[in-house]
Structures are given as structure tokens and as C-alpha cells.
Regions:
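Cleavable N-terminal export/targeting peptides
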Residues: 1-29
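Internal, hydrophobic beta-strand segments that form the core of beta-sheet-rich folds
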Residues: 166-167
């Protein structure tokens, strides 16, 4: 009887030891992922000064495995620009389609990452002034660029994490629109940076 009890206790102990890695899993990066965040942004056009902005954004992703994730990210910010080709009250939007690379370990509750994306960048300007002439219509600048970024996820549990992200976008504004008038040969260098603080969830 004693041998049976010892054997049973040993089997229970082995089962507990075998189950520990599953129970200890602290993070996941696989499957569908959604997130929301606050955004702090800067924008610099040509040789002008940096202009600061605030706003928020949304994140949608799908992790094919522990490392590689395809994502779509939208960020919107609002700020004033006083020394650019178009002055006024600016609202800027970024739409990123890209790939994120996680340096993941499922037993660790923090996961750093790097990402790269192609970005559409659109600016709408209210109360616009072009060459010292006030515009009756809103003015829009449209362009594209490449975004490089990185960040770190801090997991509260296996599927819910705080997300800290820094992204930099370089590119050009190539089209300007004012009402029904459009000019497609614009060539304005523009750099923008975003610092995002939010949460991310794997349902």
C-alpha cells in the first residue's frame, strides 16, 4: 500500500512538473490582435521646425507565428503649423501597412519588437493660408512614405498587454488639394515621428 501511495504521489508530482510550462506561459503573439493607443506626434516639413501634436490610434494585426505579424495601424493627430508652405489648423492621419517582428518568448511577460511599413500620410488644413492668401476651402496634402519603428509589450496576462511604440516616417507630400483644385506635382519632404502608449489584446 505504501508503495502504491508513493507511486501515486510521484505520478502527481511528475504531472505537475510537466504542466508547469503551460501554466507559466506569460505572453502570446500568435493569432488576431487588436489595440488602441494615445499618440504624441511631431511633423517637420522641408527645413521647418518640428511641430507637436496629440491624438490617438487603432491597431489590427495577425501573428502567423511567434515572430512574424502582419499589421494595419491608423493614427490621427491635431496641431498647429506656423512656418510651412500651408499654414493653419492641421489634422494629420497615418495609415500603416507593415510587418512586425517580435523577439518573443512565451515564458516571458515582456516582448520587444521591430516593425517596418509602407505609409499613406494625409493632412487636412482648416483656415489655410498659402503664400499669404487665405483659402476659402480646406487644404489637403497627400503623400506616402516608409515607416520604421519598434517598441515593447508588457503583459498583464497571456493575452493582454501594455504597448509602448516609437515610429518614424520619412517621405514626401506629392499632391495638394484646395476645394475642387488639385496640383499633383508637389514635392515637399516631410518627416514625422509618433510615440504611442496603449493596450493590445489577443482575443
Amino acid at each position: 500500500m505504501r508503495r502504491v501511495l508513493v507511486l501515486a504521489a510521484s505520478l502527481v508530482l511528475l504531472a505537475c512538473i510537466g504542466a508547469r510550462p503551460v501554466e507559466a506561459q506569460a505572453s502570446t503573439t500568435r493569432g488576431f490582435n487588436v489595440g488602441i493607443h494615445f499618440t504624441g506626434s511631431t511633423l517637420k516639413i522641408e527645413d521647418g521646425d518640428n511641430n507637436n501634436a496629440g491624438g490617438g490610434g487603432l491597431w489590427f494585426g495577425y501573428g502567423f507565428n511567434r515572430t512574424v505579424q502582419l499589421f494595419l495601424q491608423f493614427d490621427g493627430t491635431q496641431f498647429d503649423v506656423n512656418d510651412a508652405a500651408v499654414e493653419g489648423d492641421w489634422t494629420m492621419g497615418h495609415a500603416d501597412l507593415g510587418v512586425r517582428f517580435h523577439f518573443a518568448n512565451s515564458l516571458r511577460s515582456w516582448v520587444p519588437y521591430l516593425q517596418v511599413a509602407t505609409t499613406a500620410r494625409v493632412v487636412s488644413v482648416q483656415n489655410g493660408v498659402v503664400n499669404d492668401v487665405a483659402q476659402a476651402d480646406d487644404v489637403s496634402l497627400v503623400g506616402a512614405g516608409i515607416t520604421l519603428g519598434g517598441g515593447i509589450l508588457f503583459y498583464f496576462n497571456e493575452s493582454f498587454a501594455a504597448d509602448l511604440q516609437l515610429a518614424w516616417t520619412g517621405g514626401k507630400f506629392t499632391r495638394i488639394e484646395a476645394g475642387s483644385v488639385s496640383y499633383n506635382d508637389l514635392n515637399l519632404d516631410a518627416q514625422s515621428a509618433r510615440f504611442n502608449v496603449g493596450v493590445s489584446w489577443w482575443p
